[in-house]
Amino acid sequence: MDCEGTDGEGLGCTGWFSVEAIVEKHTGETISEDEIEYSSDTGSDLIGFIDDSNISDGAEQQVAQALFQAQETQANKKAVRALKRKLLGSQNSPLQDITNQSNSQQSTDEVNNLQAKRRAVDSVPDSGYGYTEVETLTPVQVDKHNEQNGDSVCSQGGSSGSVSDMEVDIGAQASSVTKICELLKCSNVKAALLSKFKTVYGVSYTELVRVFKSDKTCCSDWVCAAFGVAGSVAESLKTLIQPYCLYYHIQCLTCNWGVLPLMLIRFTCAKNRATIKKCLCTLLNVPDTQLLIEPPKLRSTAVALYFYKTGLSNISETHGDTPEWIVRQTQLEHSFEDTIFDLSKMVQWAFDHDITDDSEIAFKYAQLADIESNAAAFLKSNCQAKYVKDCATMTRHYKRAQKRSMGMSQWLQHRCSKIEDGGTWKDIARFLRYQNVNFIYFLQVLKQFLKGTPKHNCIVIYGPPNTGKSQFAMSFIKFVQGSVISYVNSNSHFWLQPLEDAKVALLDDATYGCWLYIDKYLRNFLDGNPCCIDRKHRSLIQVRCPPLIITSNINPQDDNSLMYLHSRVTVIPFPNTFPFDSNGNPVYELTDVNWKSFFSTTWSRLDLEEDADKENGEPLPAFKCVPGENTRLL
């Protein structure tokens, strides 16, 4: 600001002398020794050189007031800075980081302060509960301001005293949010969450849960912990979570981060961690980084007792029926039910469900541990692999003995009992008619085939490719649960071993080389006479060859080199291509239900025997390998 009577700084020292003269006159400063040296100079030669006619007393006073105001402003800033260091330097203050800044960064631009405020406000998410921006703005603004400008908050405009008071009050309310913001700066957020959980609840979170590495693994029971939840939101969670679950156990404790709820939730259906994160983030209004979600340890008695005892306290809120894994490990009557493992019960289960594969037995029986005490004892055993192998071996023995004890009529009746009703035999009859096969002729051939009549023990279905030969034969073999042999294994001595336990067998797609092999080695097989079969790691066994179906593109009766097979096979030609509709579905459905309907309709035509000894509609009495139990009390 130029003083009155001065047009500008000008050239040389003209402007300086004009200001200095006024300041010297009114401030009473001591004259320097350099100026005393020229005190003898009267300045008569400079009379009239400076025109001070325009300088008035008002201009002199204005300059003095401006200087005084600048000095007072600087003194006030120093006083405010000293006061803030005194009041905000305690350990419990959320704004204590201000005192760590350097004094060399005290000048602040007003525009930068406003931009820093805007960034701080925009970075705070609105929770929808109260004045979130007001509660979180001040601590964030202090950190941002200290990092960029180094000045105190009180120098950012307005009354310094009122701003300082507001920061202290709001900072006390927003301390929990400040702690959460500090959490995001941690190098290992999960470790910080686990540490805080153990500090608040006195128990390690990892002791309550088992770890799922994948977020896509589904489970019905989950243990969830949330950090930095508002008190009103935590209270309303007990109502908001009910539509999503069958049971919940919620306990809430407070810390300097806010409310920390611990939840054991059984959802209405199995959910994965990613789905639960989305649900809880919506209900609790917290980011997923502030959530711990893992399934509980279902077989840990300590975990069951923890949730059982805390459920009885006044800090917990429960809803719904208690999960069975807690009841089983905490109530006395259920503890009596824990017995040692019984292999016979496992074998009975595998036999009833017709499961003979080791892996399938292990997987499906382990899934019954929640509802079956013997399965739970199986999981607790250290010999699970041995039990699975023994169970599969015994099941196969029982199944093999059961099949051998049945005749063909009993076996077909047994297979029909395993299949639901609702099929139609007409699809099979129409398909045979489509292939120009007389239905009555087919029934006569099938009757002799099922009885194993010599010279009629083998049916050959031949024709061009894509005529449905394999489809027809495979559907029949699947219904009667027969065995399939492949000529590709003919170099092995054991390739005929599946015929040992088969009621009906199939050799699919026999080539000319296969027919030569049959003509050379398997003539007695086609006759249905007893023969000897080599078995791997076991001695030879003498069996009667079961009825055999062969599909081929070659008609053996047309080849004179196979003349010894002409009387041993019954040939049925399939000349027409298998039909499909416009959607690619087969026109004739060759399914198990249709084959059941076929045999039920043609039972008397096929001369199959009725079981006169059957009871309650069952061809054989139910197999039972579990000893009976006396339920009477002493």
UniProtKB/Swiss-Prot annotation:
Residues 91-128 are annotated as: Disordered. It comes from the Viruses. InterPro entries: Helicase_SF3_DNA-vir, P-loop_NTPase, PPV_DNA_helicase_E1_C, PPV_DNA_helicase_E1_N, PPV_E1_DBD, PPV_E1_DBD_sf, Rep_E1_papillomaV, Znf_lg_T-Ag_D1_dom_sf. Its main location: host cell. Residues 172-338 are annotated as: DNA-binding region. Its EC number is 5.6.2.4. Phosphorylated. A motif (Nuclear localization signal) lies at residues 84-86. GO terms for biological process: DNA replication. It catalyses: Couples ATP hydrolysis with the unwinding of duplex DNA by translocating in the 3'-5' direction; ATP + H2O = ADP + phosphate + H(+). It holds the Pfam family PPV_E1_C. Belongs to the papillomaviridae E1 protein family. ATP-dependent DNA 3'-5' helicase required for initiation of viral DNA replication. It forms a complex with the viral E2 protein. The E1-E2 complex binds to the replication origin which contains binding sites for both proteins. During the initial step, a dimer of E1 interacts with a dimer of protein E2 leading to a complex that binds the viral origin of replication with high specificity. Then, a second dimer of E1 displaces the E2 dimer in an ATP-dependent manner to form the E1 tetramer. This is Replication protein E1.
